Amino acid sequence: MTSEAAPASTAVTYKRVMLKISGEALMGDQGYGLHPPTVQRIAREVQAVHRLGVEICMVIGGGNIFRGLQGSAQGMERTTADYMGMLATVMNALAMQAALESLGIFTRVISAIPMDQVCEPYIRRRAVRHLEKKRVCIFAAGTGNPYFTTDTAATLRANEMACQAIFKGTKVDGVYDKDPRKFADARRYETVSYDECLQKHLGVMDASAIALARDNDLPIIVFSLDEPGGFCGILRGEGTYTRVQG
């Protein structure tokens, strides 16, 4: 493993950011579970940003393993289903930690549900100190409470960590007025307001997450995680994306 901090090589727009990705982003074309080459590819995208000197927080969903709402829809008690989903996010966080550390990036998995033999408990001041030491912090187990999504967890942790923006990595290069994979005339927004996202149900994040970002003036940058170098490029003022703001 290499040194914990990487010197900044060029000017960047943000000093500290939250990267939110879905669990499905880790499964590649398999349809379920973890696809190690895909996890490694995403880790390399994070590595490129880390080399710029940016402090990185991450939240990863668990839908590639288990989704609480799905379990609830099939008759499982909602609270139990949500806790199972939270545990799935811990598995994904550990996989990403392993990939990042194989690239020489010191990484901490920090869980909202204590499991001391597996990862650290969430203590805000300790997490901030990790970031200051240029360690990547992956926040797992959502908020630790049922009925809250990992989108809401990402927005909550981004606010607590004083991140300057949330980067939402998706399958498309921004927010569209309709699904660009189904409609050739779909229009991409350069910028869009929090309220318009809520009113038009644009699917950026769930309503609670968008409202929390709006109330704290935290911009959301929606970009394609499949675009090589996309995450790093946006931080250098390049690339295609949508900015959600007030």
UniProtKB/Swiss-Prot annotation:
According to UniProt, the reaction catalysed is: UMP + ATP = UDP + ADP
Q: Which residues bind ATP?
A: 20-23, 63, 67, 170, 176, 179
Mark the transmembrane ranges: none
Q: One MF term from GO for this chain?
A: UMP kinase activity
Q: What InterPro entries would the database entry show? A: AceGlu_kinase-like_sf (IPR036393), Asp/Glu/Uridylate_kinase (IPR001048), Uridylate_kinase (IPR011817), Uridylate_kinase_bac (IPR015963)
Q: What is its main location?
A: cytoplasm
Q: Which domain of life is it from?
A: Bacteria
GO BP terms: namely: 'de novo' CTP biosynthetic process; UDP biosynthetic process
On subunit structure and binding partners, the annotation says:
Homohexamer.
Q: What is this protein called?
A: Uridylate kinase
Q: Which organism is it from?
A: Cereibacter sphaeroides (strain ATCC 17025 / ATH 2.4.3)
- The gene that this protein is the product of is pyrH
